[in-house]
């Protein structure tokens, strides 16, 4: 049986010696992958990333996607990714993303540490009622069977 509480988890993203914690919804429709590495993508609202990324990046995602990367410090430039996507009502969209150091996912049953994932910066709100700030796909949980970079800790 699948209940509403099974649809949510807590996410902590670690990047550049900082961390940000947020509530995430598990989205069965999120099959987004970064095209070169094929890593799964977690979509995160921009406002949930203010502790992790410099304002120069967060406030200029559209400019950066358009090719204006002059404002980016080199230590961030190598971590940034461009992620093409299609969704209902929006074909050929692109999101700016980055490779975090690690992501910790807390569910009712366990805690999982994931290294191989990409975070996409979403400029709008994902939830009208601010119930969550991130969307992650089921494939992140399914990958744990074949991916040695995921560590699971039972509660």
Question: What is each residue range found by the language model?
Answer:
Residues 36-48, 56, 124-136:
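A signal for specific C-terminal beta-sheet/loop modules enriched in small/flexible residues
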Residues 1-43, 48-51, 60-61:
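Canonical alpha-helical transmembrane segment with a positive-inside/aromatic-interface signature
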Residues 54-70, 136-155:
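A short, charged
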Residues 9-14, 18-28, 63-140:
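Aspartyl protease catalytic core from the pepsin/retropepsin fold
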Residues 6-8, 27, 40, 46-47, ...:
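A broadly tuned "polar low-complexity/structure-edge" signature
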């Amino acid at each position: 049986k699948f209940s509403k509480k099974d649809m949510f988890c807590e996410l902590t993203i670690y990047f550049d010696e900082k961390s940000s914690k947020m509530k995430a919804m598990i989205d069965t429709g999120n099959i987004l992958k970064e095209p070169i590495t094929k890593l799964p993508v977690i979509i995160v609202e921009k406002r949930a990333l203010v502790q992790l990324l410099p304002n120069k990046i967060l406030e200029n995602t559209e400019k950066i996607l358009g090719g204006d990367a002059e404002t980016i410090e080199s230590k961030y430039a190598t971590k940034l990714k461009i992620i093409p996507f299609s969704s209902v009502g929006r074909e050929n969209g692109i999101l700016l993303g980055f490779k975090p150091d690690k992501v910790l996912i807390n569910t009712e049953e366990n805690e999982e540490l994931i290294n191989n994932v990409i975070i996409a910066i979403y400029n709008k709100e994902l939830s009208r009622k601010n119930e969550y700030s991130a969307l992650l796909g089921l494939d992140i949980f399914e990958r744990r069977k074949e991916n040695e970079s995921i560590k699971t800790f039972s509660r």
